[in-house]
């Protein structure tokens, strides 16, 4: 496996260091290339992601990212110039966000209910395509528009991916949308789900408006197995899903090209946390979870299962103990 490593900003390098130790333990011999992308690269060169580096990234099998963002750089510049550019250039049309409440982790929900579902979020369409504009800016007659783009092709491949995952899990898929108001896009999504469902007769299908889904994530999260949704709704509900499972510090994500034409990218959901960077106190658990997602995507199923098991055992016995970044990494390595 040829792996591109982008440690990034803030606590990114610290958590990625521990994640790579785990990767090396379960899959020795991975060929790693490190790329210094983020605030340092921007301040040094004025570029966020040079074209030549993007071409190099395309030659790898997968990408592991730490975190991007720094207060010394204008807000959104790194995110758009690096994360979104990689997503669109490498056709990361699936954003995969597992949501699992591990034993030993305290949920804000009463009674620590059983939570184990996956959100499949379409990653390259919706209102995030930059299709919009503004006129008469700064006047009382300003008009601003953001157009949500939904194509039959894009919706179909997200729905197809979600059904495939549901087939391998508990065989239940929920479409989350708002088709009573967003009638055009909502109709396309629902008709696509119904069409693809015919290929998976043993997968039960449900629909929920996005506002109802947020309620049920809090009151009855056990009803969900696989959720499929568009880019905007997915962006919102995945953070809620992380919150009920103990917080974004325990959330991993995959930005996936399901066709395997381009390398997919895996990262912890948390940010760069510049306020604690360099102190050795950042929790690398989510970065290690990202390694598990990466391994599963690369069909290294046994290695992924070993990492999952080690993380689960670590969380089950950790309690409220405050541990350093390195100590958490050592504990997870020990569980292997």
UniProtKB/Swiss-Prot annotation:
Q: What class of enzyme is it?
A: oxidoreductase
User: According to its UniProt record, which protein family does this protein belong to?
Assistant: Belongs to the isocitrate and isopropylmalate dehydrogenases family. LeuB type 2 subfamily.
Q: Does the keyword DNA damage apply?
A: no
Annotated InterPro entries: ICDH/IPMDH (IPR050501), IsoCit/isopropylmalate_DH_CS (IPR019818), IsoPropMal-DH-like_dom (IPR024084), LeuB_actb (IPR023698)
Q: How does this chain assemble?
A: Homodimer.
Q: Which Enzyme Commission number(s) are on file for it? A: 1.1.1.85
Entry GO terms, CC: cytoplasm
Free-text comment on the cofactor: Binds 1 Mg(2+) or Mn(2+) ion per subunit.
Under which name does UniProt file this protein?
Answer: 3-isopropylmalate dehydrogenase
Q: Name the positions where substrate binds.
A: 87, 97, 121, 211
* Cofactor(s) the record lists: Mg(2+); Mn(2+)
A single GO molecular function, which one?
NAD binding
Question: Matching Pfam families, A to Z?
Answer: Iso_dh
PANTHER family reported in the protein's UniProt record:
D-MALATE DEHYDROGENASE [DECARBOXYLATING]
Q: Where does NAD(+) bind?
A: 271-283
Lineage, top-rank taxon, reads Bacteria
Which transformation does this protein catalyse, written as a reaction? Answer: (2R,3S)-3-isopropylmalate + NAD(+) = 4-methyl-2-oxopentanoate + CO2 + NADH
What pathway or pathways are given for this protein in its record?
Amino-acid biosynthesis; L-leucine biosynthesis; L-leucine from 3-methyl-2-oxobutanoate: step 3/4
């Amino acid at each position: 496996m040829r792996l591109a490593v982008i440690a990034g900003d803030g606590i990114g390098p610290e958590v990625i260091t521990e994640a790579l130790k785990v990767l090396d333990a379960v899959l020795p011999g991975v060929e790693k290339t490190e790329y210094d992308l983020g605030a340092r690269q921007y301040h040094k060169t004025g570029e966020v992601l040079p074209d030549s580096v993007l071409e190099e990234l395309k030659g790898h099998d997968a990408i592991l990212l730490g975190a991007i963002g720094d207060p010394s750089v204008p807000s959104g510049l790194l995110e758009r110039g690096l994360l979104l550019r990689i997503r669109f250039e490498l056709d990361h049309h699936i954003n995969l966000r597992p949501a699992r409440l591990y034993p030993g982790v305290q949920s804000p929900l009463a009674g620590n209910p059983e939570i184990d579902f996956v959100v499949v979020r379409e990653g390259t369409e919706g209102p995030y395509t930059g299709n919009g504009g503004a006129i008469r800016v700064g006047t009382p007659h300003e008009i601003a528009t953001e157009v949500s783009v939904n194509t039959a092709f894009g919706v179909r491949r997200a729905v197809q991916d979600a059904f495939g995952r549901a087939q391998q899990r508990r065989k239940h898929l929920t479409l989350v949308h708002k088709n009573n108001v967003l009638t055009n896009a909502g109709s396309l999504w629902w008709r696509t789900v119904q069409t693809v469902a015919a290929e998976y007769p043993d997968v039960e299908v449900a629909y929920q408006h996005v506002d109802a889904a947020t309620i049920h994530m809090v009151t009855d999260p056990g009803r969900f197995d696989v959720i499929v949704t568009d880019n905007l709704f997915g962006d919102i509900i995945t953070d809620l899903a992380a919150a009920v499972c103990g917080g974004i510090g325990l959330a991993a994500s995959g930005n996936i090209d399901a066709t395997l034409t381009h390398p997919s990218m895996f990262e912890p959901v948390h940010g760069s946390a510049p306020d604690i960077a360099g102190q050795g106190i950042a929790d690398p658990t989510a970065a290690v979870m990202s390694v598990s997602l990466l391994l599963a995507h690369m069909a290294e199923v046994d290695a992924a299962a070993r990492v999952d098991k080690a993380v689960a055992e670590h969380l089950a016995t950790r309690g409220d103990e405050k541990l350093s970044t390195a100590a958490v990494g050592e504990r997870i390595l020990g569980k292997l």
